[in-house]
């Protein structure tokens, strides 16, 4: 068998064995995707024992490309909500996440100096203790740039593997200890979160209002500021027994009924100006009007503002609301359309059909991946990651690297959504497939490289000490920040659990946190809020530690 064929076969064997091991559960907790690392260690151990020669250049390429795929797809997934997550409560949650990362880096630095642990080893232990694989890749890259011994750089994977198991279990233990320490009642926490969410979330509401203000008599709808802004949509008008779509030039009459869509405060302001709220049905049932949902899939309208489509004048159709990534928005005239937006259309059937054709409404396109933007994004990310950042006094330039560059590029492109006919929307199933493929390839190679000396290091070397260092790096930041967030920040326990899982970028911990209460979405919401920034900081922190301690 050729060297390349043997290398591919070994990678496939590692993936099969590792994914199988990852499915093992002990009290509901498993290694998950981390099982691939240990599958690689096992195969790597026997590969060295049997003197099998694998292609080093091929392994290096697969490792780096797998890492790029993983971080890029993460960025595309969370990009649309990343910047908005930094507002309001997101600032508070991300503040604790930043503190947790800083404390973890501080503990790693203290262990490095106190116990004279070699820099590559402590960076590997640090990455494993926080269960962050891209951090391992970033640490290996910066050490290579600094001129570290390649053999020592490869030993980072062993440090990672030693610390990883307690990294997975340690966060679950900390969640349990905090719950025990504060005597927390999960049901009460879920009810408190639901109550606070109801007060904070600005959902869209509807209101039927009768025109009673004589000043509006004979005034065209387009001339009524409240009905022509960005906060309220007037989707239906009823005059007598006639229900119609209100055209901009339609003149209001006293006694008209308007169906308004918007936020509660805006609707109350409109009611005060227009007249009074009435309990009158403006349903389209039994009329010539329909309400139909259509999804934006036509590249020609991507980036267009709703007003540019001129739907009211041309087709007598109004967009009553817009759903983007599960969030309902007021369909104001200045809203820019993005791929995958779901529009609520109100109008006659033939008109709605024409508008649906304009916006696309091709459901099958939501399951297709536009590959050109994927490689444009990866290319831009690699270029961005290669830009050196020179800081006075540092022995080497900092770079976002192959882990940080594609992540930042994907976050920005995911937020932009589309440029011309190019769109960065990726179906969840495709995103998950590419992400899992990337992390499996990366971990498989790391495991293969580490496996040759793993058993000897664990039994005869410093493996047990590395496990202890990893336990300190895992537990101290989690417990200290968790207690601080609960005592000082008065943070809801379910929200706290999700924040801890997101700060560690740890999906198994999120699964555990979600299982604390079957119906509350508190943990998932806080996890998603802190995950993007935490991932970015996790990638940068080993680079900063490497540069700071390289010359010391």
Curated annotation (Swiss-Prot):
Gene Ontology terms: biological process: potassium ion transport
Transmembrane segments: 4-24, 26-46, 65-85, 96-116, 117-137, 158-178, 371-391, 393-413, 439-459, 464-484, 493-513, 530-550
Membrane topology: Multi-pass membrane protein
Entry keyword set: Cell membrane, Membrane, Repeat, Transmembrane, Transmembrane helix, Transport
GO CC, alphabetical: plasma membrane
MF terms (GO), sorted A to Z: monoatomic cation transmembrane transporter activity
Alphabetical list of InterPro entries matching this protein: AAE_transporter (IPR050144), RCK_C (IPR006037), RCK_C_sf (IPR036721), Transpt_YidE_put (IPR023018), YidE_YbjL (IPR006512)
Major site of localization recorded for this protein: membrane
Localization, UniProt: Cell membrane
Superkingdom: Bacteria
Domain called RCK C-terminal: residue spans: 192-276, 279-361
Family in the record: Belongs to the AAE transporter (TC 2.A.81) family. YidE subfamily.
Protein name, as recorded: Putative transport protein Spro_0050
């Amino acid at each position: 068998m050729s060297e390349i064929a043997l290398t591919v076969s070994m990678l496939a064997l590692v993936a099969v064995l590792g994914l199988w091991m990852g499915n093992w559960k002990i009290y509901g907790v498993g290694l998950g995707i981390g099982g691939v690392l240990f599958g690689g260690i096992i195969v790597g151990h026997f590969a060295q024992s049997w003197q099998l020669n694998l292609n080093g250049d091929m392994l290096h390429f697969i490792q780096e490309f797998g890492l790029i795929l993983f971080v890029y797809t993460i960025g595309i997934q969370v990009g649309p909500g990343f910047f908005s997550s930094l507002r309001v409560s997101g600032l508070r949650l991300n503040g604790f996440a930043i503190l947790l990362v800083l404390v973890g880096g501080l503990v790693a630095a203290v262990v490095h100096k106190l116990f004279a642990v070699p820099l590559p080893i402590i960076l590997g232990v640090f990455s494993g203790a926080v269960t962050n694989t891209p951090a391992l890749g970033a640490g290996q890259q910066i050490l290579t740039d600094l001129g570290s011994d390649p053999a020592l750089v490869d030993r980072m994977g062993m440090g990672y593997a030693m610390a990883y198991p307690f990294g997975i279990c340690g966060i679950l233990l900390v969640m349990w200890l905090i719950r025990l320490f504060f005597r927390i009642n999960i049901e009460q926490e879920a009810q408190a979160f639901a109550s606070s969410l109801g007060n904070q979330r600005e959902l869209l509401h509807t209101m039927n209002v009768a025109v009673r203000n004589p000043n509006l008599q004979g005034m065209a709808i387009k001339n009524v500021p409240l009905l022509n802004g960005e906060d309220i949509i007037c989707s239906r008008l009823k005059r007598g027994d006639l229900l119609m779509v209100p055209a901009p030039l339609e003149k209001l009459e006293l006694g008209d009924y308007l169906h308004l869509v918007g936020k509660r405060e805006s609707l109350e302001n409109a009611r005060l100006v227009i007249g009074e709220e009435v309990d009158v049905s403006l349903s389209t049932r039994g009329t010539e009007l329909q309400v139909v949902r259509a999804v934006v899939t036509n590249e020609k309208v991507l980036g267009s503002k709703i007003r540019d489509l001129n739907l009211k004048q041309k087709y007598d159709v109004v967009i009553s609301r817009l759903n983007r990534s599960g969030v309902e928005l007021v369909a104001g005239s200045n809203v820019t359309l993005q791929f995958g937006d779901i529009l609520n259309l109100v109008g006659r059937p033939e008109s709605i059909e024409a508008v649906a054709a304009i916006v696309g409404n091709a459901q099958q396109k939501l399951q297709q991946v536009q590959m050109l933007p994927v490689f444009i994004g990866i290319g831009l990310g690699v270029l961005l990651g290669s830009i050196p950042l020179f800081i006075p006094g540092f022995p080497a330039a900092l770079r976002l690297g192959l882990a940080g560059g594609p992540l930042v590029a994907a976050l920005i492109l995911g937020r932009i959504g589309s440029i011309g006919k190019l769109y960065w929307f990726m179906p969840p199933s495709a995103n998950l497939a590419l992400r899992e493929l990337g992390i499996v390839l990366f971990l498989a190679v790391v495991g293969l490289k580490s496996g040759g000396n793993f058993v000897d290091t664990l039994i005869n070397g410093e493996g047990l000490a590395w496990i202890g260092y990893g336990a300190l790096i895992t537990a101290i930041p989690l417990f200290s920040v968790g207690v601080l967030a609960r005592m000082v920040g008065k943070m809801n326990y379910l929200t706290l659990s999700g924040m801890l899982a997101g700060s560690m970028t740890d999906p198994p911990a999120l699964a555990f946190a979600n299982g604390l209460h079957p119906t509350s979405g508190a943990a998932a919401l806080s996890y998603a809020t802190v995950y993007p920034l935490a991932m970015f900081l996790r990638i940068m922190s080993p680079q900063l530690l490497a540069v700071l301690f390289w010359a010391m």
